[in-house]
Amino acid sequence: ITSTPAAYLKLHLLSHGLTRPNSLNLDGIYAALPNIAWTSEGPMALSALPEAMLLARIEGRHLEVTSVDKFPKLTNYVVPDGVRIADSARVRLGAYLGAGTTVMHEGFVNFNAGTQGPNMVEGRISQGVFVAKGTDLGGSASTAGTLSGGGNHVITIGEDCLISANAGTGISLGDRCTIEAGLYITPGTQVSLLDEHGETVKTLKARELNGQSDLLFIRHSQTGVVQCRTNRQAIALNAQLHQHN
C-alpha cells in the first residue's frame, strides 16, 4: 500500500464483506494512513484541531473528539447487515463481521480480522484472526495477533468453539474446541495429554496441537498443570440472540 486512498479501499473491501481477512496485502498500511482526530463534526487533521476547538467554544458549540487514531470506527462508514455492535468504538474500519455476529460492549474487533457469523464476541479479535461460525469468545477473552510481540503465526478459530472468560489462545483451534476460563494457551505452553481414563499419555508443547479439533483445555486446580482431553460437548450459541439482528 503506497497511498491513503488505496488503504481505505482495502479497509472498505473487508468491511463490506467483499474479501476476507488475510486475503489482501496490507503491507505499508500504517505509513499510508495519517493520524486523524475523529470528531463529532467529522475527521480533522491534528494541526487544525486546536483552532476548530477554539472556534466551537466561541460559538457555543461542543466539539467532541471521540478518538485520535489512524483507523475510524467501522460504523462511521459501514454497518454490515445482520450484526449487533453494542459499543461502536470497539470495532475498527477493516473489520469483517458476518451476518448473525453480536459484538458486546467489551468485545473488540481489529482491522483485517473478524467473524464468519453467527458469533458471540465478548472478547478481543486481534489483527489477522478469523473466527468461524458458532464460536463464542467469552468476556475479556483474547486471541493473539501479529502486530506486536514478534509473533508471525496467523490465528484461526474453528466452528463451535468456546474461549471462556479471561482465557486466550496463541495457537489456532480446529472445530469444537474449548479453553476453560482464565487459561491462556501460548505456543510454548506445556500441555499434558489425557486419555479417556484421565491418565497422562504424553506432555508436549501446545504448538503441536495447532489447528486440531475436539480439544478441551483445562488447568488442574491443585497442581496448575495444563491438561488437554477430548472435548465431548461442543457449545451451541443462543439462537435467539443472533437470528434477529
Language-model regions, residue ranges each:
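Terminal amphipathic alpha-helical/low-complexity segments used for targeting or macromolecular assembly
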Residues: 1-76, 207-245
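Active-site-adjacent loop/helix segments that line or gate small-molecule/cofactor pockets in enzymes
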Residues: 68-91
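A structural motif detector for beta-strand N-caps
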Residues: 83, 89-91, 95-97, 101-103, ...
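Catalytic or ion-translocation cores adjacent to nucleophile or general acid/base/metal-coordination motifs
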Residues: 161, 183, 204, 211-213
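Composition- and surface-driven signal marking solvent-exposed, interaction-prone regions
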Residues: 174-176, 191-192, 231-232
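A conserved acidic, glycine/proline-rich C-terminal tail/linker
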Residues: 188-208
